[in-house]
Design a protein with these regions (language model features):
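N-terminal short leaders/motifs
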Residues: 114-131, 306-324, 482, 489, ...
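Short, surface-exposed polybasic-aromatic patches that bind anionic ligands, especially phosphate groups
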Residues: 545
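P-loop NTPase motor domains
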Residues: 9, 21-28, 133-436, 451, ...
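Low-complexity, polar-biased intrinsically disordered regions enriched in Pro/Ser/Thr/Gly
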Residues: 126-132, 236-245, 267, 490-509
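Basic- and hydrophobic-enriched, low-structure N-terminal and domain-boundary segments
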Residues: 1-151, 155-163, 168-170, 486, ...
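Mixed-charge, polar/low-complexity N-terminal
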Residues: 124-125, 130-131, 137, 347-348, ...
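Conserved ATP-driven motor cores of ASCE-family P-loop NTPases powering translocation/secretion/packaging/pilus
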Residues: 428-530
Length: 595
């Protein structure tokens, strides 16, 4: 049985009780007024009122009570009918309430100290504090930047945010995708000056890169599966859906071989060079199903020692394939790993210097230099990002209780060109709590949709900030115009009719208009940008002026003497510093002569 809310039933009707009591006094006044007819009583009504209101006690005369109840019911009925037929007016908001944001709108989201903020525009910033005093102003630090070629994505947004490296309250590490290698040259000195460790992964020129070995971050069987998934996802080329069988077969073989390398090979051999050697040694004879190549013999020996070994189980599934099928699988694997036939790439991945799992421990700037015209080696960059996210999330959970001590910001320029980061739609939704943020820089939103398909909307939805720097891609403009909404404007029409007499007419009306239409967005001023922050009105603001940043004077853009010399840095990075920790081993090179 539904419980009656007594409080809700009584409180709204209290005013009508007072009306009823007042009506009893008025009825009493009319009844006590001298006179035998209505006109006489009306003339003497004041006498009746004085008599009736001499006492504030309500009249309980039957006639007066009936009049009071009738008056209360009548007024309640009028109020009910009025409310039922009431029209809802929103003056000047009839067709929409869209407007541009103001300084008061952004104020709750800004930290008073300039260095403790993410730079969004010239006038808008967002605090780096993930847990502000007022929880309703908490926003994740994921940012989507969209701008056509030449709109200033690097100069007006990426570089200013990279120079936000002086905060002691919210220390930050950076992972920067550097398409042409000019960002590290421009800002490397400023970062070093503020205590940052510089690390460089260069797929454009392997000789100007530190070493990166994905095998160095394998610690368990699930890490092997993650590495294989990333490798497959970013070296698939233009494969069709019909290739699914071969992909699964390759996955089995990669998993088995990498598992063997990780658990059985010496540390110095745990790299892609060893994987290539394994595949090259896997000879298959279609006319001899019982033939065993050297890799078969190695797995047979391992199976005798450890029959339940992870690699043995995976290899056993692969060996279910017939000779001709196995040969096709090996050819497919060889084609996929063809880039590792390049000696420089094998040397690059021979061992690891990047220490990706330490970016959340201390202030570090990792620059990932890549080609913006050739994506041959971009799978290596995507693999690096995938391992980076996984390693940092695991370390945050297992070591630091869920939050890294140093926030890690990934500034991914040319995000559509680095390849697909597996499960990015899930990562952007969960990395916030671990003090990790992801900033995607695109030329058009269609790039993201082409790469991530249906997951693109999920990725965009988890970006609390989005900035439009200008562009002409129709899909992006249409979506932005719809997101900005409509405002209500005043319109008037004038008319003139001529005949025997000339008459004029003037008509005023309200209309709805997009805050900015598609054609207006297409011709947006080159110095302007549009910022959208979740829960706040959009802002039409100036792009940030890099020359106004306090650290601009330490960049190569200001003075070429501050250019960061990559070759010199890489040639000197192995020199010991006074505070470096080293291990010393004593070796006896001159033992006692053998008798």
């Amino acid at each position: 049985m539904k419980q009656v809310n007594v409080k809700k039933l009584i409180l709204p009707n209290i005013p009508y009780v007072f009306i009823a009591l007042l009506a009893t006094k008025v009825s009493e006044a009319v009844r006590l007024a001298p006179g035998s007819d209505a006109s006489t009583k009306l003339l003497n009504i004041m006498t009746g009122l004085n008599t009736a209101f001499h006492s504030l006690v309500p009249s309980f005369h039957p006639i007066d009570l009936c009049v009071g109840v009738a008056a209360a019911i009548a007024i309640r009925l009028v109020v009910y009918i009025k409310g039922k037929n009431a029209k809802k007016f929103r003056k000047n908001l009839e067709y929409g309430s869209a407007r541009w944001g103001t300084a008061e709108d952004i104020k709750p989201y800004v930290d008073p100290a300039f260095e403790n903020n993410i730079i969004l525009t010239q006038t808008e910033r967002l605090t780096m504090n993930s847990r502000p005093k007022d929880p309703k102003t908490a926003r994740n630090k994921n940012v989507l930047i969209v701008g056509g070629s030449g709109s200033g994505k690097t100069r007006f947004w990426l570089k200013p945010n990279l120079l936000q490296c002086t905060s002691k309250t919210y220390p930050t590490s950076f992972v920067v995708t550097d398409p042409k290698g000019d960002i590290v040259v421009s800002c490397g000195h400023a970062l070093q000056k503020n205590g940052y460790q510089i690390k460089i992964l260069n797929s454009l020129n392997f000789k100007k890169s530190m070493h990166y070995n994905p095998f160095a971050y394998i610690h368990s069987e699930k890490d092997i599966l993650k590495l294989v998934t990333t490798l497959i996802a970013n070296t698939k080329g233009e494969g069709k859906a019909g290739d699914d069988f071969w992909v699964k077969a390759e996955t089995l073989l990669y998993t088995a071989l990498i598992g063997y390398i990780h658990y059985e090979a010496p540390v110095e051999e745990q790299n892609f060079s060893t994987l290539i050697e394994f595949i090259n040694a896997m000879e298959v004879r279609e006319d001899d199903e019982d033939f065993k190549n050297p890799v078969d013999l190695m797995f047979d020996e391992l199976k005798k020692r450890k029959p339940d070994h992870f690699a043995v189980r995976q290899y056993g599934k692969f060996k279910l394939s017939a000779g001709k099928t196995a040969k096709s699988i090996l050819i497919s694997c060889g084609a996929r790993l063809a880039p590792f036939d390049i000696q420089e790439l094998r040397e690059l991945t021979a061992y690891d210097e990047l220490q990706l799992d330490t970016l959340g421990d201390r202030k570090t700037a990792l620059f990932i230099i890549m080609s913006d015209t050739d994506d041959t080696f971009n799978f290596l960059i995507s693999m690096c990002y995938t391992q980076l996210f996984n390693l940092l999330c695991e370390k945050a959970d297992d070591v630091y209780g869920g939050r890294l001590p140093v926030h890690v910001r990934c500034l991914i320029d040319e995000a559509a060109n680095i390849g697909q980061i597996p499960r990015l739609e899930k990562l952007v939704a969960t990395i916030r709590s671990r003090e990790i943020s992801c900033c995607l820089v695109l030329q058009a939103q269609s790039q993201l949709k082409a790469l991530y398909k249906d997951s693109a909307d999920t990725i965009i939805g988890n970006m609390d900030c989005s900035i439009f720097l200008g562009g002409k891609e129709p899909g992006t403009l249409k979506e932005l115009a719809a997101a900005l909404g409509k405002e209500t404007i005043d319109s008037y029409n004038t008319g003139e009719s001529r005949g025997r007499e000339v008459s004029h007419s003037l008509n005023y009306q309200k209309l709805g208009k997009e805050l900015m239409s598609v054609d207006e967005l297409a011709v947006l001023d080159g110095g302007k940008c549009i910022l959208q922050l979740r829960g706040v009105r959009p802002f039409l603001s100036n792009k940030y002026d890099l020359t106004k940043h306090p650290l601009y004077r330490y960049t190569a853009d200001y003075d070429k003497k501050y250019a960061f010399d990559i070759e010199r840095f890489l040639s000197h990075r192995l020199k010991l510093k006074p505070d470096d920790a080293v291990e010393v081993y004593q070796a006896d090179l001159f033992g006692e002569p053998v008798a």
